[in-house]
Amino acid sequence: MKVIAVTGYKPFELGIFKNDHPGVECIKKALRRKLTAFVEDGLEWVIISGQLGVELWAAEVVFEIQVEYPDLKLAVFTPFLEQEEGWKEDNREYYEFILSQADHVDSITKRKYESPEQFKLKNQFFIEKSDALLAVYDEEKPGSPKYIVEAAKKKGEIENYHSYFILFSDLQDIIEEEQWNNAE
């Protein structure tokens, strides 16, 4: 596996409204574990669409991993131009920082937002251009990642395409592990 697409929930879907929420570090730790293992097995590129939440947290994790594995690259392929246009200023600044550190940035449709079709095109692009999908996703709470997860599963039925998931139970295990370590 050379290229993995990473996605997951938007912050509000997780009840997270600030990047210093303790849940963010838990999610980043889970992403770090998975991505580091994939890098050790030959992963070269992580691709995201730049949406707030799991995708931008994954970008931060990639930057951390690059210290030890400088050959790992991050690409941000936005579904449309200026997707951050309606965001709050602090979210725009955070997003622009991520873009400034990414190894490659491009827009899939190369147009500003026109219709939901652009999100469908984004999902198709990500599944076509990657060897696997890593999603912070639980079928009990479908949310925004539902459509790309369905597309990945469909591709996996006909081709050698893998979907990897970080479930809520995985995040709970990390929380309990942290509590156990802090109690010692």
UniProtKB/Swiss-Prot annotation:
It comes from the Bacteria. SUPFAM superfamilies: MCP/YpsA-like. Disulfide bonds: none annotated. InterPro entries: YspA. Belongs to the UPF0398 family. This is UPF0398 protein BALH_1408. It comes from Bacillus thuringiensis (strain Al Hakam).
